[in-house]
């Protein structure tokens, strides 16, 4: 991962256009190719970003501070396969470092979440009549989807399971769906957000994004026989 703290302007050119005026920002370039622009607020959310697959090239702009040997500012052009661009004009750099993080083991679920995943995989009909399990922990470039299933019509469904369903979980599933829907062997992929409790804000966000919410009764699921599929 490369971390750059720089005075910069940012322009996004694609289906829409967006402009960030000159300010000091943190630029993250990850090993997967993604580039994101952060301010000192908004928690983990970037001001703008480009998801992989995308490619970064550095060129010289016109005029500006001495950020290159010729005295011209450096322009980062981040482009994806659709031709959308994130253009970052670097006016000055305060910090630039690279770090090798290695392979991350991924999020380790607590006991209840892990057991919920196991139980729902075993009793997949709780998702709906005709559902079948493709596999647990279906890997994506950003981590594993809890369950990958097929509905009664054979369409692909990705299921994210939480003990407490909050906005972060919906955002996580949204990112999984974005990646899975790029796979022509799986698309279109629908989403199910399953949890013991789902906060109203998370439910509203999920439903707005076309993600179905499912409340899980952990005690009832633990009491089900392993060879029985029934709704509670």
From Swiss-Prot:
SUPFAM superfamilies from the UniProt entry: Restriction endonuclease-like
Hydrolase found in the keyword field: yes
Entry's Gene Ontology molecular function annotations: DNA binding; single-stranded DNA endodeoxyribonuclease activity
Major site of localization recorded for this protein: cytoplasm
Coiled-coil positions: none
Enzyme Commission code(s) on record: 3.1.-.-
Protein localization: Cytoplasm
Function statement: Cleaves both 3' and 5' ssDNA extremities of branched DNA structures.
PANTHER family named among the record's database cross-references: ENDONUCLEASE NUCS
Protein name: Endonuclease NucS
UniProt source species: Mycobacteroides abscessus (strain ATCC 19977 / DSM 44196 / CCUG 20993 / CIP 104536 / JCM 13569 / NCTC 13031 / TMC 1543 / L948)
Origin organism lineage: Bacteria, Bacillati, Actinomycetota, Actinomycetes, Mycobacteriales
């Amino acid at each position: 991962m490369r971390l750059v703290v720089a005075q910069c302007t940012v322009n996004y050119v694609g289906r829409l256009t967006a402009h960030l005026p000159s300010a000091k920002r943190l630029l993250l370039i990850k090993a997967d190719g993604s580039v994101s622009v952060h301010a000192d607020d908004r928690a983990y959310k970037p001001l703008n970003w480009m998801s992989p697959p995308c490619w970064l090239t550095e060129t010289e702009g016109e005029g500006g501070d001495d950020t290159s040997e010729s005295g011209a500012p450096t322009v980062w052009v981040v482009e994806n396969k659709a031709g959308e661009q994130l253009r970052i004009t670097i006016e000055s750099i305060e910090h630039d470092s690279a770090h090798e993080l290695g392979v991350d083991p991924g999020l380790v679920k607590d006991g209840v979440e892990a057991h919920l995943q196991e139980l729902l995989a075993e009793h997949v009909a709780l998702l709906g009549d005709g559902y079948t399990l493709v596999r647990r922990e279906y890997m994506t470039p950003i981590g594993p989807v809890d369950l990958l299933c097929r509905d009664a019509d054979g369409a692909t469904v990705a299921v994210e399971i939480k003990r407490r369903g909050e906005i972060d979980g919906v955002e996580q599933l949204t990112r999984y769906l974005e990646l899975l829907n790029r796979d022509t062997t799986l698309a279109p992929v629908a989403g199910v957000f399953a949890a013991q409790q789902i906060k109203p804000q998370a439910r509203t966000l999920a439903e707005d994004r076309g993600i179905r919410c499912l409340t899980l009764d952990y005690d009832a699921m633990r009491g089900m026989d392993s060879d029985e599929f029934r709704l509670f």
